[in-house]
């Protein structure tokens, strides 16, 4: 099963969003704090999921950092949620990422595991 690292900057919402993924059998690690940085250096995920509903610029920065190094470029990045304007800005900066609504996140991840 794919290992997912989920970033969303609201703890209660994050716990709600990762529950269906865990129930589907995914191993999900997560980060919600703006006061600390997620440690992705040692144990890289198969997929980085970033919710654009809150602080989308912070999430974009994680994605940019991840793909800065060639060894991390094969890691898939999935952005979910966000206003149309924030999604458009993110697509302009990271066109190779995958985009979906919050409601279609699990279905999108299921397609990626094939």
Question: Which residues does each PLM region occupy?
Answer:
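Conserved phosphotransfer microenvironments
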Residues: 48-70
């Amino acid at each position: 099963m794919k290992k997912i690292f989920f970033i969303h900057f609201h703890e209660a919402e994050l716990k709600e969003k990762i529950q269906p993924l865990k129930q589907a059998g995914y191993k999900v690690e997560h980060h919600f704090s703006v006061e600390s940085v997620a440690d992705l250096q040692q144990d890289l995920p198969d997929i980085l999921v970033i919710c654009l509903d809150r602080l989308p610029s912070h999430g974009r920065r994680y994605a940019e950092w991840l793909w800065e190094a060639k060894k991390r470029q094969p890691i898939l990045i999935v952005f979910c949620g966000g206003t149309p304007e924030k999604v458009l800005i993110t697509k302009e900066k990271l066109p190779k990422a995958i985009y979906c609504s919050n409601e279609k996140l699990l279905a999108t991840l299921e397609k990626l595991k094939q």
